[in-house]
Amino acid sequence: MPFAAGQTYLFPLGSQLCHLWIIATEPDENGMFATVNFTSLKGANDQTVIIRAGEHRFVKWDTCVQYGLGELTSTERLQEFVDAGTAKMHHPIRADLVKLIVDGFDCSDFTKRRVREFVQARKTAARSQNG
């Protein structure tokens, strides 16, 4: 299954820690992409980007992006999780929310440096491809 920015998945299935994760960047030439999850706004330390109830069909109450848990992963690894039943693809998010989330990697004090640098490189590559 090809993966793309804006797709979402539930992970890890069967766990109380299961969250909705977002593929934030297009995969690079090695299949690597940045991913980040939504978490409850209540009590969250990082409120850089807030997603309001109803902005995605999974979001039933105000939610925020948890940049501190943002990671780099590969299309191969996500496919392994899907095949093993520990992840399940969900409905994609709107393009404007993807942009907001991607911009938040730079703004959040909680983003890991390697993740921030990867996202910046992917944004630069996307601008180069689009002229």
Give residue spans per PLM region.
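Short coil-to-beta transition motif at edge beta-strands of beta-rich domains
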Residues: 2-12
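A short, polar/charged loop/turn motif at coil->beta-strand junctions and beta-hairpin connectors
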Residues: 3-5, 29, 59-61
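A near-ubiquitous, low-amplitude feature marking generic local secondary-structure context
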Residues: 4, 50, 80-84
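Short beta-strand or tight-loop elements
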Residues: 5-7, 17-19, 63
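Generic structural signal for residues positioned in beta-strands
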Residues: 8-10, 34, 50, 64-66, ...
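Compact nucleic-acid interaction/catalytic patches
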Residues: 12-13, 17-58
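C-terminal terminal-subdomain/extension
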Residues: 55-131
